[in-house]
């Protein structure tokens, strides 16, 4: 507030802003920090008295649907409760098929990160030998679209029971330009944590499409690269660890608001991207460029395998050559490469994980008392079509949704259907599914 605002007073207690620590402005009214604290005490007393009043009246307290439900705070993991890398990988195996090397890298990095947090939460137990500072190791996941980058990060957050937020790097721009500020990433995490700052400071943020903020050119340009190098520069401090000011309503539409301060030192950042063309950069570095000729007998699958093998050998210098600035690469020391999904892996994704797509649709139809079956040829045909679409596991849901649309439209209105069978012909020709009706619903010879 300016020096001309010394006359401002709290609308509730009448104290001037000089008499209180904080005066919060609203539309035509003001409230001081002391009144806010008093309101919190009153609400806490009412919440504590409600169960007692209900017991005295012989009944249970009626839920007040108008009051927002506060999520119970997560119990923080002690050192002994942190799952070991083998346990983390085993849990990931239940939800994500393949990508064993990436799972190992993630499991070790996440285990070490939360060991670091448990050490920081026990300052009283330090000895003279414990003054070694453990630095944060953010993670970079490289792999084609639909290979499981986001799912891996999301599953990690589930096993650790920490807040998790996903951000899209393509929407970010430097401050002052059209687009989102980098602080909006922290705002998403804060919202997931129900505005609990301490909880948010232990969370995981996954920044997708990170390769899209690569520099447009290796040479400095006269024009400002506000969505490329500029965003990388803006993310540097956040990745390393800083006290960031986060506007709770978004900074650009509500510029005059009190910001929430978040320490990003203990937030784990996982960045993911396809990095299309990085394999060629690695190939040039290794001196194995094939002068533009294609070897006879090369198939799309063998080309993808070669590209995936090259991505496994990526080094920080390759990322700099690709367009990431050295300072940014240095703040993401852990790198893992995901392999493209082949036909057999897509088949496994359809049927094996705990929440496999086939199991999800079987559960949906079971609620309508219908047994859903996919024969083996149908599953393979779905995987083959998904492989041709080149969008990884994401294509599977789209294909199954197309197949099941008519079935899910008709079945809720029919009580005579007992079983639904999806065949290869239905997948390839989009023909009608085979429906088996209850024997009791069949016409009898007398009625026929």
UniProtKB/Swiss-Prot annotation:
Residues 53-79 are annotated as: Disordered. One of its GO terms (biological process) is cell division. Keywords: ATP-binding, Chaperone, Metal-binding, Nucleotide-binding, Zinc. Residues 1-51 form the ClpX-type ZB domain. HAMAP family: ClpX. The gene is clpX. Belongs to the ClpX chaperone family. PROSITE patterns: CLPX_ZB. This is ATP-dependent Clp protease ATP-binding subunit ClpX. Component of the ClpX-ClpP complex. Forms a hexameric ring that, in the presence of ATP, binds to fourteen ClpP subunits assembled into a disk-like structure with a central cavity, resembling the structure of eukaryotic proteasomes. Pfam families: AAA_2 (PF07724), ClpB_D2-small (PF10431), zf-C4_ClpX (PF06689). CDD domains: RecA-like_ClpX. The keyword Metal-binding applies. InterPro entries: AAA+_ATPase, ATP-dep_Clp_protease_ClpX, ATPase_AAA_core, Clp_ATPase_C, Clp_protease_ATP-bd_su_ClpX, ClpX_bact, P-loop_NTPase, Znf_CppX_C4. The lineage of its organism: Bacteria, Bacillati, Cyanobacteriota, Cyanophyceae, Oscillatoriophycideae. Zn(2+) binds at residues 10, 13, 32, 35. SUPFAM superfamilies: Glucocorticoid receptor-like (DNA-binding domain), P-loop containing nucleoside triphosphate hydrolases.
């Amino acid at each position: 507030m300016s020096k001309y605002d010394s006359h401002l007073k709290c609308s509730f207690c009448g104290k001037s802003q000089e008499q209180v620590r904080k005066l919060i402005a609203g539309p035509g009214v003001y409230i001081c920090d002391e009144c806010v604290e008093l309101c919190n005490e009153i609400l806490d007393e009412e919440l504590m008295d409600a169960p007692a009043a209900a017991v005295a009246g012989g009944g249970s307290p009626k839920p007040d649907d108008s009051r927002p439900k506060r999520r119970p705070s997560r119990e923080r993991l002690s050192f002994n409760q942190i799952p070991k890398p083998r346990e983390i990988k085993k849990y990931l195996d239940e939800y994500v098929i393949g990508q064993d090397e990436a799972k190992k890298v993630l499991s070790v990095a996440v285990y070490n990160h939360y060991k670091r947090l448990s050490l920081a939460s026990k300052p009283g137990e330090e000895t003279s030998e414990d003054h070694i500072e453990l630095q944060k190791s953010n993670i970079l996941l490289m792999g084609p679209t639909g290979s499981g980058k986001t799912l891996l990060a999301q599953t990690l957050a589930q096993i650790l029971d920490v807040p998790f937020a996903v951000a899209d790097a393509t929407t970010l721009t430097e401050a002052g330009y059209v687009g989102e500020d980098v602080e909006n990433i922290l705002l998403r995490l804060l919202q997931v944590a129900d505005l609990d700052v301490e909880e948010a400071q232990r969370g995981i943020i996954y920044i997708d499409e990170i390769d899209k903020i690569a520099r447009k050119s290796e040479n400095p340009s006269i024009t400002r690269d506000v969505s490329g190098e500029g965003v990388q520069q803006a993310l540097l401090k956040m990745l390393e660890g800083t006290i960031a000011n986060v506007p709770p309503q978004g900074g650009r539409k509500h510029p005059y608001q009190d910001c929430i301060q978040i320490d990003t030192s203990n937030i784990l950042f996982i960045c993911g991207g396809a990095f299309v063309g990085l394999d060629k950069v690695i190939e040039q570095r290794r001196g194995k460029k094939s002068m533009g000729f294609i070897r006879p007998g090369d198939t799309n699958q063998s080309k993808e395998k070669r590209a995936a093998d090259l991505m496994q050998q990526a080094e920080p210098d390759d990322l700099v050559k690709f367009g990431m600035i050295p300072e940014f690469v240095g703040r993401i020391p852990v790198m893992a490469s995901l392999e493209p999904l082949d036909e057999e892996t897509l088949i496994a994704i359809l049927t094996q994980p705990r929440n496999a797509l086939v199991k999800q649709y079987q559960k949906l139809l079971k609620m309508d008392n219908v047994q859903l079956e996919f024969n083996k040829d149908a599953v393979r045909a779905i995987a083959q079509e998904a492989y041709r679409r080149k969008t990884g596991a994401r294509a599977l849901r789209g294909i199954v949704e197309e197949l099941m649309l008519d079935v899910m439209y008709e079945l809720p209105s029919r009580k005579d259907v007992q079983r639904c069978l999806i065949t290869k012909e239905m997948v390839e020709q989009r023909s009608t599914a085979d429906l088996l009706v209850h024997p009791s619903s069949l016409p009898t010879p007398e009625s026929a």
